[in-house]
Amino acid sequence: MNNKWDFDDENDRLVAYLPSFTYNDSVKLKEDINNAVRGKRIVYTLSEHTGALKDLGFSVEAETSGFFEGEKAIILTQYDKEERKNSKTKTENEEVLNRVREDSKQISQPCLYPVGLVQDRDLKSLAALYKKVFPKYPTNIFDPEALKKAAESDYLFAAVKNGGEVIAAASAMKTGYRSAEITDCAVKPDYRGNQLLHYLVLDLEEECRKEGINHIFSITRARSTGMNMTVKRLGYQYEGTLINNCIITSGFEDMNVWSQALK
């Protein structure tokens, strides 16, 4: 498994995926800590490397089961900016989780609209949906050409359409470690309450199975009752909250990690 580094200036963070943690990785991380000021550093790694990262000032914030080809990823973080370290919505986050945990509803009715993978002809409508739903977002989902490039590389986009218009969408971002993240979830306001994301996630799970992906996870806005409820009802397990993780809607927001094995 290869290590990957993402210097994400847009979200004032470094995200590193380190299934191995060599001397060179340690030096690279130390140099970044000593020479750069970042709001947040995030490292996904295996459990045997957590001690070395804690020695560098990192602490465990969450985990995601099966991330590294079936092995659990421990998510450790380190902050240079105190305001980034402290949640602004801790009480609200806990209230959302409590509501979600108490829910026992099962979704059984069929979807009212067709669900399927996005085609090139859908990209303008997909971008228009994202512009309508999100004033801010951590990646460029507002440009049809950027969406096309994503779909040609590591992303599977699925959509619910009505009369040719994309009214709900989500994607699965392939990690390269036989796991994938459910992300970019949006529903046009007029169509909310129809459980459309439920069917989108099911569709993406099936597409991931076809590609040999064994584990799937979602990093979900901690304040969003709807999306947390969606993945919980689909059998995902809560595995922690990432504080002020990325810019979305209202600025930096806390994100919940949910995961499950694909059977």
Show where each model-derived region lies.
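Conserved acetyl-CoA-binding loop-helix of GNAT-fold acetyltransferases
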Residues: 22-34, 187, 193-210, 229, ...
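A conserved beta-strand-loop-helix scaffold within acyl/acetyltransferase catalytic domains
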Residues: 2-13, 125-189
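A short beta-loop-alpha structural element at the N-terminal edge
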Residues: 111-126
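Conserved GNAT acetyl-CoA-binding A-motif
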Residues: 36-47, 208-220
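N-terminal charged segments
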Residues: 1-37, 50-51, 83
